[in-house]
């Protein structure tokens, strides 16, 4: 089901909703502003104990998330190259980051409302992550607006959400492939992006990226922690399972260099880092 356009209100405060119902409402909300407000209310009510852990509906039919009509989604190869030599190039880079953060909001919400047979702490972690991704999206969107642009002004691709669809059937696979692969890759590349903005004197964007990098370590760590939890529950060796899934879903492809310090803080072992670097070497 594909959802576009402007969504309706997020919730009825007169009812005690389940966390699944509320997270799903936020997930399907198409308006960026509406989604941000919805997540803020979701986190507030979760912390206040106003949400139940009932699961009133299956999620098998939900294969897409709410998003606005723009940006137009294109193949990754058709996304314009982002060079920082012009204001438009700077905006294009910021737009790409904003799109990642918008997708990350949806990914966290999807984890909250899709995977029911997990401890309350799992849902609390991903509600927190969704809230932090909302904050990141707002920071990057403001930088876009400072340059005279907004989210939706450039084309974008849907690769991150496509991986979410492929991993929807199993939280173990989702934790391995989204936080521990896609988001972990963000830990690797963000320092270089920061240097590029620093080289053109854009300290405001550098400061935004510092916040994102700091918080994303925590997001990847949450993915690592729940991946290990699920492996333990199933009697699986976590490292061999991780690399088996990488081979299955990404043909073992890996890009380097790695931000090893950040990955260690996010729950990667020295053995895993050595294995990842070996994949880079081919």
Task: List each language-model region with its residue ranges.
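N-terminal amphipathic/basic-hydrophobic helices that include classical n-h-c signal peptides
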Residues: 1-14
């Amino acid at each position: 089901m594909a959802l576009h356009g402007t969504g309706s209100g997020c919730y009825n405060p007169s009812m005690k909703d389940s966390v699944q119902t509320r997270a799903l409402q936020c997930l399907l909300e198409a308006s960026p502003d509406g989604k941000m407000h919805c997540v803020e209310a979701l986190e507030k009510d979760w912390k206040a104990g106003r949400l139940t852990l009932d699961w009133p509906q299956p999620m098998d039919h939900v294969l897409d998330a709410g998003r606005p009509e723009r940006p137009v989604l294109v193949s990754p190869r058709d996304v314009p190259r982002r060079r920082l030599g012009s204001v438009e190039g700077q905006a294009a880079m910021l737009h790409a980051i904003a799109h990642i953060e918008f997708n990350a909001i949806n990914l966290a919400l999807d984890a909250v409302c899709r995977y029911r047979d997990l401890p309350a702490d799992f849902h609390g972690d991903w509600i927190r992550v969704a809230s932090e991704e909302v904050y990141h999206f707002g920071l990057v969107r403001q930088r876009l607006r400072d340059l005279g642009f907004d989210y939706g002004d450039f084309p974008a691709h849907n690769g991150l959400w496509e991986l979410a669809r492929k991993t929807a059937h199993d939280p173990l696979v989702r934790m391995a492939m989204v936080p521990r692969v896609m988001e972990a890759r963000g830990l690797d590349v963000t320092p270089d992006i920061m240097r590029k903005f620093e080289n053109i004197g854009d300290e405001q964007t550098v400061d935004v990226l510092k916040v994102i990098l700091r918080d994303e370590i925590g997001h990847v760590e949450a993915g690592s922690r729940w991946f290990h939890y699920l492996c333990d529950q199933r009697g699986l060796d976590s490292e061999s399972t991780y690399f088996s899934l990488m081979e299955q879903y990404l043909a073992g492809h890996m890009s380097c260099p790695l931000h090893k310090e950040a990955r260690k803080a996010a729950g990667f072992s020295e053995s895993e880092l050595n294995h990842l670097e070996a994949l880079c070497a081919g």
